[in-house]
């Protein structure tokens, strides 16, 4: 005998049966256009219990056929269907795990692929689907679920991206999801696909590496670290200190950004600007002492290793500290000198060859 349960409220209706959970009539306040109430099916049925265990609770369960005949829910159309596939369990797993697959009913095939790629990234960061999104009704960022957020999205008009990833106190990741225009989502997806194909062809040796690809390889060795002017002493002494020291030990170049703003977008590095020299804003003496202490602490960490340091900006606004390992710079200088020597040697050989040809011509004319 199987369990069937119906729970109703003003905002949401659940129907739990042996085939899974059916979620009905949940309006999403995170969409810019008013979407009608819709339903989607989540086949979340796991591995069945043993028959002996089921027989112990037969008295508490009602037949599923009886529920279907009396309480069949109305069918409502949705912009996508969310399904799960039960994957075979691995040797070290005690239970089977589930993988989501989405079938969108709106948007082109390419738009659906772009949405699915972002959807899978979100589930990779937050397996239970917990996200943060902007509620356009209250104009505030609220905690929600990607399943509720994606419900009713018209891919012909909108797409969605991961704008930022926040970490909780228990080290869990919560993606900040943002709605964007459909054409922007398609362009971003096309650029990513093109970059992936180009890298594959370069790795296979089919095409030569471009300057853009070489610059990206160089940027891999650069570590970007943010330090807020309002950081706590404990966080600076533990988290940021470990982050800076580990990057220095690995021989990375460092760019440390000191700012008083909490940036929520993923492109905060590109948005960071150095203020003009005359744009010093007034801060209190206490704030200035606090910022000076933070700057001195960061400088002392960087000076522990053999590095070149450069400073941009000012303590009243924001600052950028660049750290380059001296060993890296000296090795680059050696490579540059070696290249110059090779070029000089080539030029000498060319001159000798020209002289030899001239002398041979003169001898031929004399004879």
From Swiss-Prot:
Residue interval of the organelle targeting sequence: 1-31
Pfam family, one: mIF3
GO cellular component: mitochondrion
Source organism, top-level taxon: Eukaryota
Keyword flag Mitochondrion: yes
Composition skew (Basic and acidic residues), residue ranges: 332-367
Gene Ontology biological process terms, A to Z: mitochondrial translational initiation
MF (Gene Ontology): mitochondrial ribosome binding
Keyword Mitochondrion in annotation: yes
Entry's localization field: Mitochondrion
Keywords: Mitochondrion, Transit peptide
Region (Disordered): 326-367
Family of this protein: Belongs to the AIM23 family.
Name of the protein described by the UniProt record: Altered inheritance of mitochondria protein 23, mitochondrial
Source lineage: Eukaryota, Fungi, Dikarya, Ascomycota, Saccharomycotina
Gene from which the chain derives: AIM23
């Amino acid at each position: 005998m199987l369990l069937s349960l119906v729970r109703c409220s003003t905002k949401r209706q659940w129907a739990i049966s042996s085939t899974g959970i059916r979620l009905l009539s949940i309006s999403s306040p995170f969409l810019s256009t008013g979407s009608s109430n819709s339903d989607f099916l989540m086949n979340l049925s796991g591995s069945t219990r043993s028959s002996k265990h089921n027989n112990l609770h037969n008295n508490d369960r009602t037949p599923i056929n009886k529920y279907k005949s009396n309480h069949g829910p109305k069918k409502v159309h949705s912009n996508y269907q969310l399904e799960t596939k039960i994957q075979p369990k691995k040797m070290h797993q005690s239970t089977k795990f589930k993988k989501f697959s989405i079938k969108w009913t709106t948007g082109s095939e390419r738009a659906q692929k772009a949405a699915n790629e972002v959807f899978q990234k979100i589930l990779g960061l937050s397996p239970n689907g917990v996200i943060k999104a902007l509620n356009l009704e209250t104009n505030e960022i609220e905690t929600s679920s990607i399943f509720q957020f994606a419900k009713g999205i018209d891919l012909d008009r909108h797409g969605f991206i991961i704008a930022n990833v926040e970490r909780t106190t228990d080290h869990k990741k919560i993606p900040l999801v943002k709605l964007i225009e459909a054409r922007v989502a398609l362009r971003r997806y096309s650029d990513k696909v093109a970059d992936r194909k180009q890298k594959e062809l370069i790795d296979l040796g089919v095409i030569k590496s471009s300057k853009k690809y070489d610059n990206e390889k160089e940027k891999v060795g650069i570590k970007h670290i943010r330090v807020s002017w309002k950081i706590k002493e404990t966080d600076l002494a533990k988290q940021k200190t470990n982050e800076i020291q580990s990057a220095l030990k690995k021989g990375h170049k460092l760019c440390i950004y000191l700012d008083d703003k909490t940036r929520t977008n993923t492109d905060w590095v590109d948005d960071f600007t150095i203020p003009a020299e005359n744009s010093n804003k007034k801060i209190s003496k206490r704030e200035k002492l606090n910022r000076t202490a933070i700057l001195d602490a960061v400088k002392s960490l960087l000076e522990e290793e053999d590095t070149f340091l450069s400073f941009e900006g000012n303590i009243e606004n924001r600052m950028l500290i660049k750290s380059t390992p001296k060993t890296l710079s000296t090795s680059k200088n050696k490579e540059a000198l070696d290249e110059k020597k090779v070029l000089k040697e080539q030029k000498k050989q060319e001159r000798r060859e020209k002289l030899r040809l001239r002398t041979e011509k003169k001898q031929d004319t004399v004879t």
